[in-house]
Amino acid sequence: MIDAAAEEKISACLDTSGYGDTKALLKLAKKETVTNILFDIKSVDDDIHRAYTGVSNALILENLRALCSEARIREKITLRMPLIKDVNDGMELIERTAALYKAQKLKKVDLLPYHNLGIGKQRNIGGTQKEFEKPSEEHLTEIAEFFKNFAKMEVGIYGRA
């Protein structure tokens, strides 16, 4: 699809969890028509990541580092952090996350407070999904300020309502 967009001179956004083949991800990220890369990081802590996603974050972090190793790719990246109260919003974990982002010279992060919009759909198809809470407004602001001040990042907070 990205190649078809390129033929029509349409820019594309690469939206990734980072969990995939490094060479394929780099190949897509290098394309001139890919002007934005949305890279989701659920947790930099491998134990937390495994507990809530079922897989290690090692490949995801490796792919993030690979993308960040090239300045022209790194400039396209906006990190997205889904935040769940008492799961991945503790300040120690936020500090570790910000340190990683700063070390990779990343400039933008979007904080995505948890929402339960998918729970009804899961129930309708016979599935179950654990219910979580989103962090408080005050805590979201504290996290955003930490990223701004420590990592010197541009921060967006989406889905507050």
Where are the regions that the model predicts?
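Conserved AdoMet/S-adenosylmethionine-binding subsite of the radical SAM
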Residues: 1-112, 117
